[in-house]
Swiss-Prot record:
Keyword terms: Ribonucleoprotein, Ribosomal protein, RNA-binding, rRNA-binding
Disulphide-bonded residues: none
GO biological process terms, semicolon-separated: translation
Protein name as annotated: Small ribosomal subunit protein eS4, Y isoform 1
Length: 263
C-alpha cells in the first residue's frame, strides 16, 4: 500500500522533453512540488547540468545552488529539483545571464537568453478569477500566483504582464482574435500564430483556430492557448525559428541551403 507521495522517478518514465539518455542511469530527478506540473516543468538540475552544461554531476549542481547564485522569477532557489516552467525567468547572478523558459516548435524547453530589461517581467495566463474572504476579488495565474484586486476588465484566458520585483500586474492582453499566441500543450506545442477564430462548444472544449507567419492554419483547445502579444507584436522575445514549425521537407531544404552557402 502506498503511503504518502511518490519520491522517485524512473528515467524511462521521465518526460520526453527533458531529453535524458535512457542508459545513463536508472533514476531521473523527481521535481519538487511547486508552481508547475511534473510533466510540464524542467527541474533546475536538468537545466543547469544537461542544458547549460555548467555542472557534470548532481552534486556540482547542488554546490552551485547552495551558493545562492540561481534566481527564478527574482527569488533565490536552492532546491536542485525546483520545477521551473513555461515563462519562468532564470537568472544566474555570477555570469550575468538571464533565460526565459519557452517552448521550441518540437515541444522542448529552449535555452533562450534574454536581456536584463526583459528579465524584469513575465507573462502569466489567467486561469481563474474568484471573490475571496470579505469580498476581495483575486485572480489565479498558470504559475499558481494569487493576485488580489485585479483590474475588473481582466477575464479568464487573458494574459497579464507581471513585474517580478513587486509581483504586481503592470499590463494585460485580452484573449481576442487577431492577437498573437503560443501553444502550450497538445500536438502543436510551441507553435506561434495569430488567433483567427474561436469555436464555442458548451459542455465540451472550445476550439481555437490559429494561423502562423507562414500562412499555415491549425486548431487546438482553448486551454492550450497562451496569448503573448497584441496584434502580431510579441511582448517577449521568441526563440530561434520564431515558433514556425517546418515540415520534414522544408527542414531538409533549409539544411541543404545552409550547407551549400557554408560550403
Amino acid at each position: 500500500m502506498a503511503r504518502g507521495p511518490k519520491k522517485h522517478l524512473k528515467r524511462v518514465a521521465a518526460p520526453k522533453h527533458w531529453m535524458l539518455d535512457k542508459l545513463t542511469g536508472v533514476f531521473a530527478p523527481r521535481p519538487s512540488t511547486g508552481p508547475h506540473k511534473l510533466r510540464e516543468c524542467l527541474p533546475l538540475i536538468v537545466f543547469l547540468r544537461n542544458r547549460l552544461k555548467y555542472a557534470l554531476t548532481g552534486d556540482e549542481v547542488k554546490k552551485i545552488c547552495m551558493q545562492r547564485f540561481i534566481k527564478i522569477d527574482g527569488k533565490v532557489r536552492v532546491d536542485v529539483t525546483y520545477p521551473a516552467g513555461f515563462m519562468d525567468v532564470i537568472s544566474i547572478e555570477k555570469t550575468g545571464e538571464h533565460f526565459r523558459l519557452v517552448y521550441d516548435t518540437k515541444g522542448r524547453f529552449a535555452v533562450h537568453r534574454i536581456t536584463v530589461e526583459e528579465a524584469k517581467y513575465k507573462l502569466c495566463k489567467v486561469r481563474k478569477i474568484t471573490v475571496g474572504v470579505k469580498g476581495i476579488p483575486h485572480l489565479v495565474t498558470h504559475d499558481a500566483r494569487t493576485i488580489r484586486y485585479p483590474d475588473p476588465v481582466i477575464k479568464v484566458n487573458d494574459t497579464v504582464q507581471i513585474d517580478l520585483g513587486t509581483g504586481k500586474i503592470i499590463n494585460f492582453i485580452k484573449f481576442d482574435t487577431g492577437n498573437l499566441c503560443m501553444v502550450i500543450g497538445g500536438a502543436n506545442l510551441g507553435r506561434v500564430g495569430v488567433i483567427t477564430n474561436r469555436e464555442r462548444h458548451p459542455g465540451s472544449f472550445d476550439v481555437v483556430h490559429v494561423k502562423d507567419a507562414n500562412g499555415n492554419s491549425f486548431a487546438t483547445r482553448l486551454s492550450n492557448i497562451f496569448v503573448i502579444g497584441n496584434g502580431n507584436k510579441p511582448w517577449i522575445s521568441l526563440p530561434r525559428g520564431k515558433g514556425i514549425r517546418l515540415t520534414v521537407a522544408e527542414e531538409r531544404d533549409k539544411r541543404l541551403a545552409t550547407k551549400q552557402s557554408s560550403g
